[in-house]
Amino acid sequence: MRPTSIDPALAEIGKKNGLLVWRINKFELEPVPETEHGIFFIGDAYIVLNQKYEGCWDVHFWLGKNASTDEIGVAAIKTVEIDDSLGGIPTQHREVQNYESPLFLSYFTDGIRYVAGGYESGYNHVEDQFKNWKPHLFHCKGKRNVRCTEVECEVGSLNLGDVFILDLGKDIYIWMPPDSGRLERVKGMARAKNIADVERMGASKVHILDDEWDNDPTFWSYFGGVSSVKKVTKSKDDDDNYWKRLSEQITLWKVSDVTGAAKVTMVGQGENLKKELLDSKDAFILDAINGGIFVWIGRECTLEERSKALIWGQNYLKQHHLPKWTQVTRVLDTAESTQFTQWFRDWVDEKKKNTFQPLLFQVSDESGLLHVEEIANFTQEDLDGDDVMILDALNSIYVWVGSNANPNEKKEALNTAKSYLEKDKLPRHKKTSIDTIYQGQEPPTFKKFFPSWDDALFKNQVRSVENMRRLLFH
């Protein structure tokens, strides 16, 4: 059923550029204040709207792993309302906890934080004056896209390779063991400062435990005493999802919904998909393997068909036994994003001229496990000197080697790029070049892909943990 009116909570949408966030509360939308952007209760569902400029909108509905079926349903309905009020042209995205898209993560520069419970959990906010406060332990994991997930406040939750935040209300401890990464430390400090200064309005004090990581009596009192440090294990390597499914072919499917039960028929396969396969009278699903699932809606489709796009995408996941967290994005005929058009060899947009947006990936080799992470809306500051980065400019691949990358990463940098190119499915020139570039020696051909460039950024350790500590807390 189509909504008969627009929710009053949506009155401000489309009026200015920036981010708006709503949380589902008893079948209604509750605006999330800017000070709480990036905090997500895992028992709830949220809607996030980003306006880059008038006419360019991305609407995401985010699902916590414990969100109820009712909350998920309300989020879907409200997403349709937003779509209607903005003329039916936003790009829609379905986001699942722990598997958010790089675009979604790019909105929250200090990373995101998952909080246990849901709307009815009785979570203590600032106005509770810290009464009956229970300790919260957050595990900060990831390279550029850091996620802070609430875990059990016990010694078994700690490991020596990651950063943890112990939130005691009036006191916040950042635990940074020696094996934790530079970026995780910097992001952990930024997140803790945000909690203290913004969420708590200066009512909390931040304690940084780096040199004192194994002997601070107050911190360890919550984990059985200082002697418990011997029980802490090394970091557990998580299997990386980036390389999965890459042996499969990209496929294009036509959607038929005549009987009310959507069916899909394959109309194209491989790396030579052509734009002419799309028909404005119909809807199509593009399975771009690790690029996600796109539901393309022809301009002659009905409003009802537009509203079903993400449902069709979810049904496709079920029919093809794909993980529930697979990215699903709705795109509209004549308003396609480059993330969609890049998969078609002959797609040329005369308005945009260039139909490919460069992609930046962070590559790290932790304990022999290759980890690849895409960074959306990237800037020069996203180049991390601790790792190897891959900049994909379609017909040119740049391997940027950070000065502090480990020896194996440096040695395997070129092979990593070759592996990336061999397994990638984008239609590109057969003679695509691979160039290796070292930190501090970037040529103009590389710098041009960044919004701005400052040669001084990589000098004098301006982005070291110690320097960031001084900037944040002094």
UniProtKB/Swiss-Prot annotation:
Q: Enumerate the Gelsolin-like repeat regions by residue range.
A: 27-105, 147-202, 272-337, 374-446
Region (Necessary for barbed end capping activity) residue ranges read 1-238
Record-linked CDD domains: gelsolin_S1_like, gelsolin_S2_like, gelsolin_S3_like, gelsolin_S6_like
Q: Which Gene Ontology CC terms are recorded?
A: actin cytoskeleton; cytoplasm
Arranged from A to Z, the UniProt key words for this protein are: Actin capping, Actin-binding, Calcium, Cytoplasm, Cytoskeleton, Repeat
Q: Which SUPFAM superfamilies does the record cross-reference, listed alphabetically?
A: Actin depolymerizing proteins
Q: Where in the cell is it found?
A: Cytoplasm, Cytoskeleton
Instruction: Using the UniProt annotation, give all residue ranges assigned to the region (Required for phosphatidylinositol 4,5-bisphosphate binding and regulation).
Output: 133-226
Main subcellular location: cytoplasm
List the disulfide bonds in this chain. none
Pfam families the UniProt entry points to: Gelsolin
The record ties this protein, via SMART domains, to:
GEL
Query: In this chain's numbering, which residues are marked as the site (Cleavage)?
Result: D387, V388
Please list where the region (Actin-actin interfilament contact point) is annotated: 70-73
Q: Where is this region: Required for synapse elimination during development?
A: 106-147
Cited function: Calcium-regulated, actin-modulating protein that binds to the plus (or barbed) ends of actin monomers or filaments, preventing monomer exchange (end-blocking or capping). Binds actin but does not nucleate actin polymerization, albeit slows down elongation by blocking the barbed ends. By promoting actin depolymerization, required for the elimination of presynaptic components downstream of the egl-1, ced-4 and ced-3 apoptotic pathway during larval development.
What is the name attached to this protein's record? Gelsolin-like protein 1
Taxonomic source organism: Caenorhabditis briggsae
Q: What is the lineage of its organism?
A: Eukaryota, Metazoa, Ecdysozoa, Nematoda, Chromadorea
